[in-house]
Structures are given as structure tokens and as C-alpha cells.
């Protein structure tokens, strides 16, 4: 059994760690609330854009934009949104597992794959994994703007426009609630037709003055808004996962302190018993 002094030092060390994890839990909770506010503010715009684009994809247009045309999938691109920092449980691991599973299906069909990682952990993972990375972004912070993402997104759009990509997906952790964050893969290009719209009478549009100019601007703005929403959702998911992970670490530290305190008490008791035995033995010898 370790000595009482050694155990006491270990208890002090665990208590210091517990203070750190408790502080990180509170910081994550505060950041999560702010991230939720940003997510709630941008979600209606992203969903409205998705609805409008769903109608556009379903409608019969005189001008057929390249983003509406489905072509054979020979090259597939993934925009993978992960975190810049760790200590958020299995959030990134679960996301990467989902990407690799989907990637396996495309490779079995003979498709080539490119990655556009967003977030330091995503960049690090795909550098070690291998594969083509035409663009990446990291260090966006807790409150990125859409301007921080435009350059990265447009590299992937340019590749699609030039025929270097036939499919483009975004992968991120969708914030469901504080305890649940679900990794999702959403198709960006070609524009997916809305199932909801398919079951209803589709809208018809009259474009003024020129459908090409309008759609070129609208569809690029749509892609940018969906990527931005994915990043915002992932940040909220990151802070929620970190808060839960730090709470678990704090609780575990408390249990460890209690266990060590019991060991310390037993060590103290054994030391006192030994001292008393030595005193009694000495007195008997005299």
C-alpha cells in the first residue's frame, strides 16, 4: 500500500484536475448557449433557402443550370466539418466513421474522392488518411462568419463547375439537443429534389430579367448558406459534447477522490496501529 503522504499528494493533484474540468464545463455551457443562439438565428434562413431550392430543382425550367443536372458520379467531394480542439468526447470520431462508411460505398462504385476539411481535427485526420485535399480551413473560432468560408467553398464549386467533381456533400454534426449530436451527410450538388415538394403541386417560376444570372447567384448563395449552417451546427454540437465530457470527468474525479480518501484513511490507520505496537513492544522490553 502507498504511504499516506503519497496518497495525500495524489488527492491534491486530482482535486486540481477536478477544478480545471469543472471550469471547462462552465465555459462550454456558456459557449453552447451563444452557439445555440447563432444556430437558431441562421437556421430559418437556411431552411427557407433549402425549400426554395427544392422547388427550383423540382420545377421545369427553360434554362437548366449545371447544378440541377445529374451526371454519372465518377468523382465525389466531401466538405467535412469537425472541431478545432479536442476534449469533446467521441464527436469527431463518430463523424469520421460515418464519412469512411459512405466513402467505402462510393469507392466500390469506382468513384474517386476528394476532401475539403474544415476544422483543425478534420485537416489533421484527412492528412494522415490520405487523398486529395484541394482546399481546407481551420482556426475559425467560436463565431465564424460566412465570409470566412466563402473562399474554401468556392474552390469546391469551381471543381464542380469544371467537371472535376460530379457530387458534392457536406458532413457535420447536427445539434439535436444537449445530450444528442448526430453526424449527418447532406448532398449539396447536384441539388437534391425535395421529397415534400414532389408530393405536392410544384411551383412554377417566371424569372426576370434573366434566369441564368439569377440562378448563378442564388444557387451559389444557397451552397454557401448550407455550409455555414453546417459549421454553426457543428460548433453548437462541439460545445454541448465538451460540456457533457467535462461534467463526466468532474464526476469521475469526485469518485476517485472519495476512493483515494478511503485508501488514505486506511494507510493512516495502519501507520497509527504500527506506532502503537512499537510503543507497547518497547514498554514491554523495559
Swiss-Prot record:
GO terms for biological process: proton motive force-driven plasma membrane ATP synthesis. It is a peripheral membrane protein. It is found in: Cell inner membrane. SUPFAM superfamilies: ATP synthase (F1-ATPase), gamma subunit (SSF52943). InterPro entries: ATP_synth_F1_ATPase_gsu, ATP_synth_F1_gsu, ATP_synth_F1_gsu_CS. PROSITE patterns: ATPASE_GAMMA. GO terms for cellular component: plasma membrane; proton-transporting ATP synthase complex. Keywords: ATP synthesis, Cell inner membrane, Cell membrane, CF(1), Hydrogen ion transport, Ion transport, Membrane, Transport. Pfam families: ATP-synt. One of its GO terms (molecular function) is ATP binding. F-type ATPases have 2 components, CF(1) - the catalytic core - and CF(0) - the membrane proton channel. CF(1) has five subunits: alpha(3), beta(3), gamma(1), delta(1), epsilon(1). CF(0) has three main subunits: a, b and c. NCBIfam families: ATPsyn_F1gamma (TIGR01146), PRK05621.1-1 (NF004144). Produces ATP from ADP in the presence of a proton gradient across the membrane. The gamma chain is believed to be important in regulating ATPase activity and the flow of protons through the CF(0) complex. Belongs to the ATPase gamma chain family. This is ATP synthase gamma chain.
Amino acid at each position: 500500500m502507498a504511504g499516506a503522504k503519497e496518497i495525500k499528494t495524489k488527492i491534491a493533484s486530482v482535486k486540481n484536475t477536478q477544478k480545471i474540468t469543472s471550469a471547462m464545463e462552465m465555459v462550454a455551457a456558456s459557449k453552447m448557449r451563444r452557439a445555440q443562439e447563432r444556430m437558431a438565428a441562421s437556421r430559418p434562413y437556411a431552411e427557407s433557402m433549402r425549400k426554395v431550392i427544392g422547388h427550383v430543382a423540382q420545377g421545369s425550367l427553360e434554362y437548366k443550370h449545371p447544378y440541377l443536372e445529374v451526371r454519372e458520379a465518377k468523382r465525389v467531394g466531401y466538405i467535412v466539418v469537425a472541431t478545432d480542439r479536442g476534449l469533446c468526447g467521441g464527436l469527431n470520431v463518430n463523424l469520421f466513421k460515418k464519412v469512411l462508411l459512405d466513402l467505402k460505398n462510393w469507392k466500390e462504385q469506382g468513384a474517386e474522392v476528394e476532401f475539403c476539411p474544415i476544422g483543425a481535427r478534420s485537416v489533421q485526420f484527412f492528412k494522415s488518411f490520405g487523398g486529395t485535399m484541394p482546399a481546407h480551413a481551420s482556426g475559425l473560432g467560436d463565431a465564424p462568419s460566412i465570409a470566412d468560408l466563402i473562399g474554401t467553398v468556392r474552390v469546391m464549386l469551381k471543381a464542380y463547375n469544371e467537371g472535376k467533381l460530379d457530387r458534392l456533400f457536406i458532413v457535420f454534426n447536427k445539434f439535436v439537443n444537449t445530450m444528442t449530436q448526430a453526424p449527418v451527410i447532406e448532398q449539396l450538388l447536384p441539388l437534391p429534389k425535395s421529397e415534400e415538394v414532389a408530393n405536392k403541386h410544384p411551383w412554377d417560376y417566371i424569372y426576370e430579367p434573366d434566369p441564368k444570372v439569377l440562378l448563378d447567384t442564388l444557387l451559389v448563395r444557397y451552397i454557401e448558406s448550407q455550409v455555414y449552417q453546417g459549421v454553426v451546427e457543428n460548433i453548437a454540437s462541439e460545445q454541448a459534447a465538451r460540456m457533457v465530457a467535462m461534467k463526466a470527468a468532474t464526476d469521475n474525479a469526485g469518485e476517485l477522490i472519495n476512493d483515494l480518501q478511503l485508501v488514505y484513511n486506511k494507510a493512516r490507520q495502519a501507520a497509527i496501529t504500527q506506532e502503537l505496537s512499537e510503543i507497547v513492544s518497547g514498554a514491554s522490553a523495559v
